[in-house]
Amino acid sequence: MLNTLVVFLGAGLGGALRYGVNVSAARLGGSFPAATMIINVSGSLAMGILAGWFVVRAGLPQSLRLFLTTGILGGFTTFSTFSLEAFLLIERGALAQAVLYVIGSVAAGIAGVAVSFAIIRHFG
């Protein structure tokens, strides 16, 4: 139960941070999704730092890891988890799996949005 609460609180903070970046980037104007790119890249950088930190400091509490990674970064961007998982596949020498994971995730994600839009436009 404590872990669920820790993730819940972290996700709220991460979501608020994401909203702040979106609001700030909107002031810049333009049609390029700069906020999403900033969020994805900074979240991936933070995930790498945290994952490395938790490896080096193996004795840190599980609740801290959950709060920072699953909670805050999960609320901020799930792209950081995607990036970490792809990197770990590459690091383990599973290059074919990594390529399949990256291409498959991106293609399936875009296809999912396209199919959803088509359904809503048809029945909407």
Swiss-Prot record:
Pfam families listed in its UniProt record: CRCB (PF02537)
Subcellular location: Cell inner membrane
Keyword Glycoprotein: no
Keywords: Cell inner membrane, Cell membrane, Ion channel, Ion transport, Membrane, Metal-binding, Sodium, Transmembrane, Transmembrane helix, Transport
Entry GO MF terms: fluoride channel activity; metal ion binding
GO CC term, one of those recorded: plasma membrane
Origin: domain of life: Bacteria
Location, primary (coarse class): membrane
Binding locations of Na(+): 74, 77
Keyword Acetylation: no
Ways its activity is controlled: Na(+) is not transported, but it plays an essential structural role and its presence is essential for fluoride channel function.
A single GO BP: cellular detoxification of fluoride
Role of this protein: Fluoride-specific ion channel. Important for reducing fluoride concentration in the cell, thus reducing its toxicity.
Family: Belongs to the fluoride channel Fluc/FEX (TC 1.A.43) family.
Protein name: Fluoride-specific ion channel FluC
Organism name: Methylobacterium sp. (strain 4-46)
